[in-house]
Swiss-Prot record:
PTM notes: The N-terminus is blocked.
Lineage of source species: Eukaryota, Metazoa, Chordata, Craniata, Vertebrata
Organism: Aquarana catesbeiana
SUPFAM superfamilies per record: gamma-Crystallin-like
Keywords: Eye lens protein, Repeat
GO BP terms in the entry: lens development in camera-type eye; visual perception
Protein name in the entry: Beta-crystallin A1-1
Gene3D superfamilies: Crystallins
Highest taxon above the source species: Eukaryota
Domain notes: Has a two-domain beta-structure, folded into four very similar Greek key motifs.
GO molecular function: structural constituent of eye lens
Amino acid sequence: MAQINPLPVPLGPWKITVYDQENFQGKRMEFTSSCTNIMECGFDNIRSLKVECGAWIGYEHTSFCGQQFVLERGEYPPWDAWSATNAYHIERLMSFRPICSANHKESKLVIFEKENFIGRQWELRDDYPSLQAMGWGNNEVGSMKVQCGAWVCYQYPGYRGYQYILESDHHGGEYKHWREWGSHAQTFQIQSIRRIQQ
């Protein structure tokens, strides 16, 4: 039987329904907490889903590894509804968990020019479709401190490319190096950032 709640997660308003076929067809299962391996629940993959409450992170591989996808309230009929803006398209979603710290109204993030919180810094409290257009000097971010909420950072302007989900309740909110942004992080190139909505 699947281990559906491996992480200690406070009770919250989270609900996601997953389907093994596109357009909400086939086998379905509802979750109110994390799932480390959808195959242990009798699915070979997730092809569509509905986020009914809360915000979630979906992962390309089991055990919360690989490319990340932010999943906010709404319907995702085919796989490309959550993967279309990524640098490479992935038809796989094998694990997921709720984003406990998503707090759109109170979100606060500080980005730094270099690793280990060194160099020029900039405080963010809003969504930025292009960091450079808003005054950030280059297309790279060395490190970040999430002081409140949860954020999704994108490789390219316009919320495109690889997604890196940063949370105030993971790593103590401190991401001192780009390798801490996720198991799939390839570069410290960040050109757009937005708050995750609950």
